[in-house]
Every structure is written in C-alpha cells, then in structure tokens.
A protein has these predicted regions:
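Terminal accessory/targeting
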Residues: 1-4, 14-54, 66-95, 99-103, ...
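DG-centered beta-turn motif at the end of beta-strands
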Residues: 7-10
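N-terminal low-complexity, intrinsically disordered segments
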Residues: 56-61
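Gly/Ser/Thr-rich loops at beta-strand to alpha-helix junctions
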Residues: 126-130
Length: 254
C-alpha cells in the first residue's frame, strides 16, 4: 500500500512551517499544501525555494484571513470588514456565488504560480472544497487547472464530476484525539487489508512549537506539536517499513 501524509497549513506561521520541514526531513511526510493568505506564507515560499520542501500543493482557503481577490468581487464570501466568513457561517450559507469561489481559487493558485511554486495538487482548508456551498466551484476549478486533488466525497457523497486524479481513499481520523501511534497504525492496517495495492491519503498538521501567533490563528494548536513528535519518530518510520507501507507524495500519484 502507498501512503500520502499531507501536511496541511504550510504558511500558517513560521513555527508550523519549521515543523513541516522537519517532517519532510524525517522521511514520512512527502507532501504539503500552502495557504497563500497567512502570516507565514512568505516564509513558506522561502523555505520551498531553499529546497527544504520538495513538493507543494495549494491549500485553498476561504475560511481564514482575507481573500486575495478584492473583497467587493467576492461579497458572498466575506464579512463587513472584508475578512472571510468563519467556517460555520460559510458552510451554512445558501447564497454562496459559485463564480466568486472560482475567482478566489484562481487568485490563490495564480499567486502561488507567481511565487514560482510548482503546485502539484489542490486541497482545501477546513474541507471547504467538500462542503455543498463550495463543492461545485472547487470541482469546476480543479477540472480546469487539471491537477490532482484530495478526495471530495468524504463529507458530501460523490465526486463523479471530478476529472482529475485522486488517491483511492482519504481519512481524516489522524487529528485531535486521534493523534497517537496506535490509532495511526489501526487506520493504516484497516486500509492495507481493504486495498493492499491502493493509495490512501491522511492529513496531518505538525508544528515545531506553539506560540501566541498560532493560538490566535487556530483553535488546533497543542496537538500540532504531538503530531510533529510522532511524524518525526524513528518508531513510526520503522513500523511503516516493516509493514511495507510506502510513503509517497502527489508527484508519485499515477
């Protein structure tokens, strides 16, 4: 079985960025996705150009920070201050304009290209591209850009309209209370039994440390350090090798 451990939130803060780089060095994480509108974005771009992150995708973001498009061009996505709506408000919104989502996704993708990032896949922050208000626009944009994406049928069923490659499965259980070696092993063994020749993607959110900036930006903070410790541990790397689970990135997705 092949495993993609994708480190989400590259660009959120410098501590997150450093944690992701260390996970790459440890050899288990081979994929990450960058947020183009966060305090650590420029730092993440610099780390990429230093060769410390071999491959990178786009972490499309419409639930944190400000849009890269002018707020007046994406009014169904922002509040009165021009900030993105929070996820609870956005995902329950009935009047999200598909064209605005497409416009903003393209703006973030183009910003990544302009930064000389070789984007190799796309996913979305807080699963924005999976929830019903955004799914059609995310699918449309992904098909136009033509890059692989994270599976989009894990929350809202169906991805038949998606014309680009995805892993065979995506699992979100390595998160929060699910962050432990035993839980990760159980998840992977269940997929190895069900699809021994398949490719499964798991998200991860490592950080080298927790600081006030990270706490101000994310309700998920302390567990990021636990993830970092686990994902850089020799024990995990040896267990994966012993069970013939090959860690790959999206460049290897065929």
């Amino acid at each position: 079985m092949k495993l993609i451990l994708n480190a989400d939130d590259f660009g959120l803060t410098e501590t997150v960025n450093h944690g992701i780089v260390e996970c790459f060095k440890a050899g288990v994480v081979k994929s990450t996705t960058i947020m183009m509108n966060q305090p650590g974005t420029q730092h993440a771009i610099e780390l990429y150009h230093q060769g410390l992150v071999p491959e990178v995708g786009l972490h499309f973001t419409v639930t944190a920070g400000k849009p890269l498009s002018a707020p007046e061009l994406v009014p169904s996505l922002v509040d009165d201050q021009g900030n993105f709506l929070d996820k609870a408000a956005l995902f329950n919104k009935v009047d999200v304009v598909e064209g605005e989502v497409v416009l903003e996704l393209n703006a973030q993708y183009q910003a990544a290209i302009n930064a000389d990032l070789k984007i190799n896949h796309i996913d979305s922050h807080h699963f924005g591209g999976v929830f019903k208000p955004l799914k059609a626009a995310f699918t449309r944009s992904a098909n136009t850009i033509g890059l692989p994406v994270r599976r989009i049928d894990n929350i809202v069923n169906g991805q038949d309209s998606l014309l680009v490659p995805t892993p065979n499965a995506f699992d979100m259980r390595f998160f929060d209370d699910g962050v432990s070696l035993s839980n990760l092993q159980d998840i992977l063994l269940s997929y190895q039994t069900a699809m021994p020749n398949g490719t499964v993607e798991l998200m991860c959110h490592p950080s080298l440390s927790v600081d006030e900036e990270l706490k101000s930006l994310s309700g998920y903070s302390d567990k990021r350090v636990e993830e970092h410790q686990l994902l850089t541990s020799p024990e995990l790397k040896q267990w994966l090798a012993d069970h013939q689970i090959e860690c790959i990135g999206f460049d290897d997705l065929k």
